């Protein structure tokens, strides 16, 4: 059992070596005396593929978490940079929402309670009133989906 009076300190995944698997990463987090690690699901194919991890892969990570006492309470989800929820392209918006669903289900399976997401409607496209409208509509859907899994969506502060 964790000491509720202890200050918990975590580390962002991208501050750790990239060339190790998740079980090794979790052990390293523990060795470095951190209590938790934040996982990144960015716009790269490699990290987006995590949303399709099998139950066996997830169970292997769960075992490492239990064995070490390390947690993964949050996800930085920036896959929407490449596939924005406010895109003028309907196919891109559909992909964005597919990724959002996968991220929520993945979070639920992993025990992740919070998904930080970008607060912009589009990134590589020109923003407009229409892209903002699409983003707002899709964000409302995403909030409903997340709430049904008891996952919190938070908007990351953007420059």
What are the roles of these predicted feature ranges?
Residues 22-43, 110-111:
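Catalytic domains of carbohydrate-active enzymes, especially glycoside hydrolases
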Residues 19-23, 55-59, 90:
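Structural motif corresponding to alpha-helix initiation and N-cap regions
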Residues 37-39, 73-75, 115:
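Hydrophobic residues within beta-strands of alpha/beta enzymes
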Residues 38-66, 119-126:
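Glycine-rich, proline-tolerant flexible connector loops at the mouths of alpha/beta enzymes
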Residues 2-20:
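Boundary/entry segment of secreted carbohydrate-active catalytic domains
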Residues 3, 23-24, 66-68, 83-159:
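Active-site acidic/histidine proton-transfer and metal-coordination neighborhood
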Residues 16-18, 53, 95, 134:
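Residues that cap or flank secondary-structure elements
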Residues 12-16, 40-44, 77-80, 120-122, ...:
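Active-site beta-loop-alpha junctions enriched in small/polar residues
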